[in-house]
UniProtKB/Swiss-Prot annotation:
Keywords: Amphibian defense peptide, Antibiotic, Antimicrobial, Disulfide bond, Secreted. This is Rugosin-A. Has antibacterial activity against Gram-positive bacteria. Pfam families: Antimicrobial_2 (PF08023). Belongs to the frog skin active peptide (FSAP) family. Brevinin subfamily. It is found in: Secreted. Disulfide bonds join 27-33. One of its GO terms (biological process) is defense response to bacterium. InterPro entries: Antimicrobial_frog_2. Expressed by the skin glands. GO terms for cellular component: extracellular region. It comes from Glandirana rugosa (Japanese wrinkled frog).
């Protein structure tokens, strides 16, 4: 239902945001950006 759709959407956004943060952090640590 709607709640499940919303939950999946929130999870995928959280995953995407987490990946972005990890990429930025490793980039800054490695000075590779």
């Amino acid at each position: 239902g709607l709640l499940n759709t919303f939950k999946d959407w929130a999870i995928s956004i959280a995953k995407g945001a987490g990946k972005g943060v990890l990429t930025t952090l490793s980039c800054k640590l490695d000075k590779s950006c």
